[in-house]
Amino acid sequence: MHDSTACQDDGSVREQWDRWFRVGAILVLALAAVNLFFRLDREVVTEWDEALYAISAAETARNGNWIGTTFDGALDYYNTKPPLNIWLIALSFKAFGVTLVTLRVASALAAWLTVLVLMLWARRAFGATTALLSGLVLSATYGFIYVHSGRSANTDALFTLLVLLTVVTLWGGRDHPWRLAWLGPVLAAVFLLRGMAVLMPLILVVTVLVVGGRRPGERRWPALTAALMLTVLPIAWWAWARWRLDGWQFLGPMFQYDFVARTATPLEGHTGSLLYYPNNLQKDHYVWLIATAVAIFLFPLSRERFRRLWSELSGNAYAQTLAGAWLGVTVLIPTMMQTKVAWYLNPFYPIFALLVGRMFAQGFACASASSAAWRRRVLTGTVLLALAIVEGKLFHYSYTMRDVRHTVQGLLLEERQTLAGQRVYQDRWMRADRFVLEHVIGGYAREAQGVGGFVLAARRGDYVIVPQPDGDGSEIVLVRANRRHRLCRRAD
């Protein structure tokens, strides 16, 4: 489909973007790869919820507990989500070993594929200009990269990809009804990943199919029947296997706690007002919002321009319903829930990138249609400056807030060969630190209070981690230190 933006150029700019789409897409995907994979092994494992998935996946890979996943060797009833994310991480561990990269590679790959899918679909739906600019924005969206998402082992990156695939499948199903059958595997994957969070894409599907209407004589029921079967069968297989293991001990809380309680009450202190998510959006993504405001200032939206901004949707009730439902479920559902956390906004980021990219595309179309070349240069500079600022923010966050070097985990990883098979003591082990020691390095975590407790409990050659400046004395010998901690060995 051609790129029909709010301003009509002579076709030269549109043709130029089309001609350079492949090169531009490669560059955008390269940027996304850098932002998602660079230093993936040099960032600290977080306590919530990355460490929970890490330990359960490592135990699954080691012990084969694929149906009833465990935590510290016992069936896990705290994490009430189905096991797809644990399965993916465990398969990565079995294939390539337990490392910080294999822990996160499934999420990082899912986020990278989200950028790819958004660009390929947006080119068909809205043209090359919108596609490339949307992909660029999404590749450098802080929340999409860091907030429980692409660079962590949590479920949110894959969930965002699956919601986007739901939108793409519904869009394609308008002209090719049998493509709706793909909704089955997508919805099944969402349930096996996030349980009752499947309601978000399910509400989207029902809204579009019921409200959006259909063409006269169109037969959807064979494809929708296939979709229903492909949704139910994988879910029923896993639910039956889990029920045979422990009855309703897991399945009951999966519904009651992870859906009813999370929706009706603010769990674990995660509260917020109706402005919680708008506030998070402006706090984390003010650079792209300011750049969008500059584009609107340079090329003001008259009534005619605003009407034609999304001309591809004009006169198409199905597409309009899909666009409205996509925006609605990704914004209204998290807002209505009583439990509010920043990463519930992750499925919204592809449509956020599409909206921002479309405004930039409109600006470039207007610039080509007018004689004000300086506005085009200002808009180009604004987009590039915004990208540079966001990239700087991402790298700064990686090197300062998430850097593993000055943590307990960094100390352990620097001495991984020394500590393999050894006992290491600490006052209290955090889950994330224990995962690194026991599953990445192959050591054994033990607890003792202070240097005195360590000396009493330890054997000759055991190790202890103490905060700076502790660790001096005849009973222990310094092995390595960073800014905050010391790794010491009991003196022979």
PLM regions and their residue ranges:
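Short periplasmic/luminal acceptor-recognition loop of GT-C membrane glycosyltransferases, typified by
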Residues: 386-490
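Transmembrane-helix motifs of polytopic, lipid-linked glycan transferases
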Residues: 105-126, 165
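Specific aromatic-rich, kink-prone transmembrane helix
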Residues: 117, 158-175, 186, 352-355
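Hydrophobic/aromatic-rich transmembrane helices and adjacent perimembrane loops
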Residues: 338-369
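Transmembrane-helix signature of polytopic, membrane-embedded enzymes
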Residues: 21-28, 118-141
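Extracytosolic helix-loop segments that constitute the early lumenal/periplasmic catalytic or substrate-binding loops
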Residues: 34-38, 52-77, 84-87, 91
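Membrane-interface transmembrane helices that cradle and orient dolichyl/undecaprenyl
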Residues: 13-14, 124, 129, 163-182, ...
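Transmembrane-lumen/periplasm boundary regions of multi-pass, lipid-linked membrane glycan transferases
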Residues: 53-59, 185, 189, 193, ...
